Amino acid sequence: MNKLIELLPSIKAVGFDLDDTLWDNRQTIIDAVNAQNEALVKQGLEQEHIAVVYKEHLDKTVSQEPELQSDVSALRLRVLESIANEHGWEASIAGNIYQAFYEARQNVLVYDDAIELLNHLKKDFQLAVISNGNVDVKQVGIDHYFDLVYRAGPDGIAKPHQDMFVKAHDAFNINDDEFLYVGDHIVNDAQAAMDAGSYAILINEEDIDLGPRCLRYKTLSDFKADVLRYLKF
C-alpha cells in the first residue's frame, strides 16, 4: 500500500509552509527587493551601493538585536530605520520604504495544484500555516482554507525551532504524531516537524532519505496525486 495512504488515517491536522511550497518565491523576492531599492534610490542612495549599505546595517542590527532574526518583517524595518537614521531622513521614510517592499512581497502566484490540494484536504483535515515569511494569506486570498496561521515573530520563534509546531499541536488539541507538515526545506520544514514529534512531507527534488517519518515528493503535484488517491481509497 502507498505510504501516504497508510499514514493519513492517523493524521488529524495538516500544516503548510508557504514560500516555495505553495508558490515559487524566487521572482517575488527579487521584485520586492527591487521595489525597496527603488525607494532607497529616490532618497538619494546610489543603486550600486545599496547592497553593501544594507548588508552593513543588517549585520549591525543582528549583532545588537539577535532576537529579530525570528521576525523578518521587524528585522527589515529595523535595518531600514538604521539606514534612515544614518542619513538623517525623517522617521516615517523607513516605514514607507518597508511598505514598498511589503506590498511587492504579497504578489505571489499560488500554484493551481496548491489550490486543488487545499480544497480537497479542507474537507477532511484541520489546516494550518507555519511560516517564517511575511506573506499575508488573507491578501493572497487563501486564508479561508486555514484554521490557524502562525508566522515567525508575531506568533512564535522561527523554524527550525519547534515553538510554532508545539503551539499548533496545542491549538488543535492533538498529539504530536497526529500532525503532518508539508514544506520544501530539509531543515526548516521536514526536520523541524520531525523534531517536534510530527510527520513531514518534503517537497524537494533532492534525492534524500530523512527516515520513516518523512515522505519525499519531487513536486507538489506528485503529493496532490497521492492525496487524491487516499481520499478516493
Predicted stretch roles:
Residues M1-V14, R26, Q43-E48, E90-S92, ...:
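Asp-based, Mg2+/Mn2+-dependent phosphohydrolase catalytic module
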Residues N2-D112:
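N-terminal helical cap/lid subdomain that shapes the substrate entry/recognition surface
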